[in-house]
């Protein structure tokens, strides 16, 4: 079963007004050594990077392509993280983070989204270094 954070407690953490010069997303994407790298959450659960890309949006109507929409980090267990910058405020952009994770243990599939996604979110914060760049340990909005 795939647990997605689309409309649940930890759906979409939002970190507004980020200085874009501090965002190291592209460096992460452009570093091939990140493929195969294992990150361990504070809970002890490990995630090994299987693929990283900078995704694009293809309009379903006119088929126009908008490149560099954000990064996707895929893990060997089927979990993934999507991070993208959106908009610009007077002091920077907003980082939107989407996380989904795969859980094969049936007993765990009935736990709360917050509990199930916490390890993957922990790893997303390690990779993005958002607490370092923003001075915040949690997002201002969770949808």
Feature names for model-found ranges:
Residues 1-101, 105-106, 110-118, 122, ...:
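Phosphate-binding and adjacent anionic-ligand microenvironments
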């Amino acid at each position: 079963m795939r647990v997605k954070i689309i409309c649940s407690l930890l759906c979409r953490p939002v970190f507004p007004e980020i200085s874009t010069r501090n965002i190291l997303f592209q460096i992460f994407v452009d570093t091939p050594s990140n493929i195969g790298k294992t990150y361990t959450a504070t809970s002890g659960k490990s995630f090994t990077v299987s693929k990283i890309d900078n995704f694009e949006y293809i309009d379903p109507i006119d088929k126009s392509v908008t490149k560099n929409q954000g990064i996707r980090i895929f893990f060997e267990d089927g979990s993934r993280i999507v991070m993208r910058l959106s908009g610009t405020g007077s002091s920077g952009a907003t980082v939107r983070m989407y996380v989904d994770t795969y859980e094969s243990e049936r007993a765990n599939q009935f736990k709360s989204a917050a509990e199930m996604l916490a390890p993957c979110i922990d790893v997303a914060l390690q990779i993005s270094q958002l607490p370092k760049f923003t001075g915040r340990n949690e997002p201002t909005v969770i949808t």
